[in-house]
Design a protein with these regions (language model features):
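Polar low-complexity intrinsically disordered regions
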Residues: 1, 16-22, 58
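Bacterial N-terminal signal peptides that target proteins for export
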Residues: 1-7
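HKD-type phospholipase D/PLD-like phosphodiesterase module
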Residues: 20-48, 66-67, 71-180
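Short catalytic-loop micro-motif centered on adjacent basic/acidic residues
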Residues: 53-57, 81-83
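Secreted/periplasmic proteins that engage bacterial cell-wall peptidoglycan
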Residues: 58-61, 65-68
């Protein structure tokens, strides 16, 4: 990446990239927080969802994003959420109880089973969503207020990303079906 391209990426909170020399229609957008307020882009995608929203994020404390998922469920969209078990148990702002109250299917997961130090297993540290089998949101961005206003984070939005969305959907379903 040239210095000019890197400078442009740092100055503009949402950058759209299109594949060059390809018939592919996939559009990639990048958002950087805290200046980019990535939650606004996530909210837009949730609000436009028609059939399915699959969300796997380590930390979920953002009230607006949680409410948008509840509204999507009320519109008839299938919504499923996977969050990290330890984060949810140790953070009073985590939205696990909210999702249960809204009857949104929820899994509290740990990471893959492996011995790490003095504990078994790691973290469920994924940060992605698949929307209507054609949109993928992924990056370092946890769905928290801190991610929007304090932390240096990134979010990639892939639209019209059928094959990529299917890979992420498979990864989500593997998490969902893993024994607790």
């Amino acid at each position: 990446m040239t210095r000019a391209a890197l400078a442009a990426a740092m100055l503009f909170p949402l950058i759209t990239l299109r594949p060059v020399g390809s018939a592919a229609e996939m559009v990639v957008q990048a958002c950087f927080s805290p200046q980019g307020k990535c939650s606004a882009h996530i909210l837009r995608e949730i609000d436009q969802a028609k059939k399915e929203l699959l969300v796997a994020v380590y930390a979920f404390t953002n009230d607006d994003l949680a409410s948008a998922l509840a509204q999507a469920k009320k519109r008839g969209v299938t919504v499923q959420v996977v969050i990290d078990r330890e984060f949810d148990a140790g953070n009073e702002k985590s939205k696990g109880k909210f999702f249960e109250a809204q009857k949104i299917p929820l899994r509290r997961m740990t990471g893959a089973k492996s011995k790490t130090g003095d504990r078994d297993g790691g973290l469920m540290h994924q940060k992605f969503a698949v929307i209507d089998r054609r949109i993928v949101l992924t990056g370092s961005y946890n769905w928290t207020h801190a991610a929007d206003s304090l932390n240096d984070e990134n979010l990639l939005l892939f639209r019209d990303a059928g094959p990529l969305a299917e890979e992420y959907r498979k990864a989500f379903l593997q998490l969902w079906e893993r024994k607790l």
